[in-house]
Amino acid sequence: MIVFLKDLFNNPLLYENKKIFLKGWIRNCRFQKKLFFIDFNDGTFINDLQIVCKKDKNFFLEKIKKKLQIGASIEIEGFLVKNFKINDIFELEAEKINILGSSSFEYLIQPKNHSKAFLRKIPHLRLRTKIFGSVFRIRSAVFLAIHEFFKNEDFLLTNTPIITVNDGEGAGDLFQITTLNLEKLVLTKDKKIDYLKDFFGRKTFLSVTGQLELEALATSFNKVYSLGPIFRADNSNTIKHVAEFWMLEVEMAFSNLEKNMEIIERMLKKVVKSCLLTNQNDLKFLDENESPGLIKKLNEFIGLKSFPKIKYKEAMDILIKSGVDFEFKPFHGSDFYTEHEKYLTEVHFKSPVFIIDWPKEIKAFYMKINPDKKTVACVDLLVPFVGELVGGSQREENLEILKNRMKELNISSENLEWYLDLRRFGSCVHSGFGLGFERLLIYLTGVENIRDVIAFPLSSKSINF
């Protein structure tokens, strides 16, 4: 029977002294006079299985030895036995090896430590390393844990358009898409591009958020969420930014900002706890090889009674009075930079922290204006090591206030009349949030660079797939 390493390592006694079949790849080969060894992995588990090949007992194994190369895919038949030196370690005594796909000395993933900078140049092969194997098994588990949480909370899973005419965030970092022939553009009489000739008959873009559409869904189905790709033409060349990433977006009818924060905290603790249970071996490897103290940090996260919550003004006062010589001097009315987020989460609070009631001038048009007329009912969740993980708000449900806010910011209602309809017909208090999926993975894995938690990362001047 075909056995996966995950099942074998989790319950080796079930397979002891039994003939089994394995399919996977060679991680390493070691040759001795009377026997040779293969470090074998099939991608389902962090640990390799040692394959023992006794040449004096099997002429076939001696013959195939010359064809064995690191990276080759193989099929193995043999018996699982205990290592004669270390009683609690199992290995496979091979009877037959079949090479399914050959490799060569040119294979770039050799059994040594490779820098992440080197591995980023070969994303199609780096997935075969232990660190990236761990990261992407955890990525899969987090996806499933998120869906499980919202299923149990009776949320409707939905999808929002990837192609749009709106800039939901108002940042302007949009990828424009077109079917027009850029070599032979059709111009109008006043020398402008004639978008009537384009596929949709108007300018269109890749979506930067599905929030606006989710609000329509929430006012129909009460509680909704989506988990999908987001695109931003952001030239920031930092360890936190890429052009394509995944976003968890949630909208809830009849929910205020407090309910928003409650669901954020409960969801995150549930996901982290689930990951600690289902990915113990991968997290142990990352703790020992990538981010010392990772497991302790995650256990402390789920052990917190509740995340601290402060107003923007209080957070800014903490920074101003800290006595720290920040590169970017904090002042009331400014946004937080990475160094400010690090101070608040890693020095002052030493924990995640909710920051609420931000100045309306630095937040989006759809956020509910507070009674003071100066701030909006929004929240950012900052966490150690990552910074901003979640951004959310109570949405403005009053039609006239929303229209006035759009006028203040010179936002045309031409493409947003449908959004205003949500306030015209059956408006209600509602709130929601967005969570950067890859930023959550950075926190969970201890891997610093967002490009290392996405299989095929895209950034400015960098696209190969």
Curated annotation (Swiss-Prot):
E.C. number: 6.1.1.22
Keywords in alphabetical order: Aminoacyl-tRNA synthetase, ATP-binding, Cytoplasm, Ligase, Nucleotide-binding, Protein biosynthesis
GO cellular component terms, semicolon-separated: cytoplasm
GO biological process, one term: asparaginyl-tRNA aminoacylation
Recorded catalytic activity of this chain's protein: tRNA(Asn) + L-asparagine + ATP = L-asparaginyl-tRNA(Asn) + AMP + diphosphate + H(+)
Keyword Nucleotide-binding: yes
Enzyme class: ligase
GO molecular function, one term: ATP binding
Main localisation: cytoplasm
SUPFAM superfamilies: Class II aaRS and biotin synthetases, Nucleic acid-binding proteins
Subcellular location: Cytoplasm
Pfam families listed in its UniProt record: tRNA-synt_2 (PF00152), tRNA_anti-codon (PF01336)
Family as reported in the entry's similarity comment: Belongs to the class-II aminoacyl-tRNA synthetase family.
UniProt xrefs under NCBIfam families: asnS (TIGR00457), PRK03932.1 (NF003037)
Assembly, per entry: Homodimer.
Matching HAMAP family: Asn_tRNA_synth
The protein's name in its UniProt record: Asparagine--tRNA ligase
Organism: Phytoplasma mali (strain AT)
Taxonomic lineage from the root: Bacteria, Bacillati, Mycoplasmatota, Mollicutes, Acholeplasmatales
The encoding gene: asnS
